[in-house]
Swiss-Prot record:
The organism's taxonomic lineage, starting at the top: Bacteria, Pseudomonadati, Pseudomonadota, Alphaproteobacteria, Hyphomicrobiales
Active site (record annotation): 353 (proton donor), 384, 513
Recorded catalytic activity of this chain's protein: alpha-D-glucose 6-phosphate = beta-D-fructose 6-phosphate
HAMAP family assigned: G6P_isomerase (MF_00473)
Pathway in which this enzyme or protein is active: Carbohydrate biosynthesis; gluconeogenesis; Carbohydrate degradation; glycolysis; D-glyceraldehyde 3-phosphate and glycerone phosphate from D-glucose: step 2/4
Name the record gives this protein: Glucose-6-phosphate isomerase
Annotated keywords: Cytoplasm, Gluconeogenesis, Glycolysis, Isomerase
An annotated Gene Ontology molecular function: glucose-6-phosphate isomerase activity
GO CC terms of this entry: cytosol
Gene3D superfamilies according to UniProt: 1.10.1390.10, Glucose-6-phosphate isomerase like protein, domain 1
Subcellular localization: Cytoplasm
Family matches, as CDD domains: SIS_PGI_1, SIS_PGI_2
Gene Ontology BP terms: gluconeogenesis; glucose 6-phosphate metabolic process; glycolytic process
Source organism (scientific name): Brucella anthropi (strain ATCC 49188 / DSM 6882 / CCUG 24695 / JCM 21032 / LMG 3331 / NBRC 15819 / NCTC 12168 / Alc 37) (Ochrobactrum anthropi)
EC identifiers of the protein: 5.3.1.9
Length: 549
């Protein structure tokens, strides 16, 4: 069925009324009166558990949210994506990052062309190159083995590889991986400053080979290699992830060191493509294929599971409920896993660049809120930074906890148990809170004077009823990471379909780029700031004065 705008609008209205009527809903009371709440409001896929029972929902909420998914034609749009239809309507492109991890023998067609053989060919070339670097068969210009790789990219060409490389550090048995993204010269200076050009491979990740930040850093790295080893050495110390073969060749990189991808792969969905080359070099082709396999397992689940049993659908529906119905403008991603420290930033781009839109696919203003602000840090660090606001602040911010049942360090299992206890405690504390009477009783138990009890007790009250959901998997390995990231990709898709927006363009990044190009000669003093707004003129004048001081 097609998207039913009338039914969708009516269901949203029902949800808003339902929320208004159930706003006093007390989760503590709900858990006491309903012993089956966890079983009804959780789903599993193999070892991956998704628990949303600590969100402020009931059976009526769940029924209405399912109606919403049907009215938005989530299933139909999902089928269109997997079929290679041009669902990115503003750029007239297919959206097929799922093909990058499709290990089946089925055809995946884009405009009548089966793309799977192309995907396999690039993946096999990546594997051969990675094996050569890792084994030492492919050496630097001086004959030394490559010990370090530097990936130069930005946005999707950086955030995904950074996140995955850190997350899978227990599986590293190849060269050390470093990442440079910022145009700030400090980033590349600090990175190259600790490396030896003779044992370093630089990967330039830019589809067009024109991204200003990436190419500026690439030229700096090129000069670093050429100054140390000579111009002739450049080719042996660079590789590229790009489709601009002429520009890559002009830079000095041979075609057999260039790995491409396709316009049906968006940057924030590209870690599965040749953009993942630094990950593959770090962990090896075999584990990289497990990473892809984990994502594919979630793709199959998302594609085939019915709505009521579909983890990605319900993660998306709960996200929509929190944002558009409850009015929560922020979403905190809290992995209780230090190796997932960069996951919140990765999901920040995935979600905010996809769903940070204010017009529908038809170019009309949206009728309500769209994507939330996404942020986070690992637990337990966050507990000692911003959890104060999450527990006692005036804004309600839903949390999404991510944790593994088992850690990698067997000799530190007692510390992992402490980590697990903290994760569960935060989830429970947000839900339960602490009443004024409970705070008084706790203080009285410490034999404080009555006056002191009354003075301090209000400060120890926690309102509770603050929503959180929890994702638990067995262990953070390549398969589990791939599955987790794909889950969030599909969650973003589901939310976008209900919002009625295109999750696969990012026009919002363009205006600032255009103005930066205009302002560069103004900042450098080659052109006047005349004609610009008074604030910009004042800032330019101040910068000119301070740079000369």
């Amino acid at each position: 069925m097609a998207r039913d705008a009338t039914k969708l609008e009516a269901t949203v209205a029902k949800l808003k009324k339902h929320w208004a009527d159930s706003a006093p809903h007390d989760m503590r009371a709900a858990f006491k009166s309903d012993p089956g709440r966890f079983e009804r409001y959780s789903l599993s896929l193999d070892d991956l558990l998704f628990d949303w029972s600590k969100c402020r929902v009931n059976d009526e909420t769940i029924g209405l949210l399912k109606e919403l998914a049907i009215a938005a034609d989530v299933e139909g749009r999902r089928a269109a994506m997997f079929a290679g239809e041009h669902i990115n309507n503003t750029e007239d492109r297919a959206v097929l990052h799922v093909a990058l991890r499709d290990t089946s023998s089925k055809e995946v067609l884009v405009d009548g062309h089966n793309v799977l053989p192309d995907v396999k060919e690039v993946l096999d070339r990546m594997a051969a190159f990675a094996d050569g670097i890792r084994s030492g068969a492919i050496k630097g210009a001086t004959g030394k083995k490559i010990t370090d790789i530097v990936n130069i990219g930005i946005g999707g060409s950086d955030l995904g590889p950074v996140m995955a490389t850190l997350a899978l550090s227990p599986y590293h048995d190849g060269p050390r991986a470093h990442f440079v993204s910022n145009i700030d010269g400090a980033h590349i200076a600090d990175t190259l400053g600790i490396l030896d050009p003779a044992t370093t491979l630089v990967i330039i990740a830019s589809k067009t080979f024109t991204t200003i930040e990436t190419m500026t850093n690439a030229q700096t790295a090129r000069k670093w290699v050429a100054d140390a080893l000579g111009e002739a050495a450049v080719g042996a110390h660079f590789a590229a992830v790009s489709t601009a073969l002429d520009r890559v060749a002009a830079f000095g990189i041979a075609e057999d060191r260039v790995f491409g991808f396709w316009d049906w792969v968006g940057g924030r969905y590209s870690v599965w493509s040749a953009i993942g080359l630094p990950v593959m070099i770090a962990i090896g082709p075999e584990d990289f294929r497990k990473f892809l396999a984990g994502a594919h397992s979630m793709d199959v689940h998302f594609r085939d599971a019915p709505l009521e049993k579909n983890l990605a659908v319900w993660l998306g529906l709960i996200g929509y409920w929190h944002r558009a119905i409850c009015g929560y403008g922020s979403r905190a991603i809290i992995p209780y896993d230090q190796r997932l420290a960069r996951l919140p930033a990765y999901l920040q781009q995935l979600d905010m660049e996809s769903n940070g839109k204010s017009v529908t696919v038809d170019g009309k203003p949206v009728s309500g809120p769209t994507g939330p602000v996404v942020w986070g840090e690992p637990g337990t660090n966050g507990q000692h930074a911003f959890f104060q606001l999450l527990h006692q602040g005036t804004d309600t911010i839903p949390l999404e906890f991510i944790v593994a049942a088992k850690g990698h360090e067997k000799h530190l299992d007692h510390q992992h148990e402490m980590l697990l206890a903290n994760c569960l405690a935060q989830s429970e504390a947000l839900m339960k809170g602490r009443t004024l009477d409970e705070a008084r009783a706790q203080l009285k138990a410490k034999n404080l004077p009555e006056s002191e009890v009354e003075r301090i007790a209000p400060h120890r009250v926690f309102s509770g009823n603050r929503p959180s959901l929890t994702l638990v998997h067995d262990k953070l390995d390549p398969f589990a990471l791939g599955r987790l990231v794909a889950l969030y990709e599909h969650r973003v898709f589901v939310e976008a379909q209900i919002f009625g927006i295109n999750a696969f363009d990012q026009w919002g990044v363009e205006l600032g780029k255009e103005l930066a190009t205009e302002l560069l000669p103004v900042v450098s003093g080659e052109e006047s700031s005349d004609g610009r707004d008074a604030s910009t003129q004042g800032l330019v004048a101040h910068l000119h004065a301070r740079r000369k001081a």
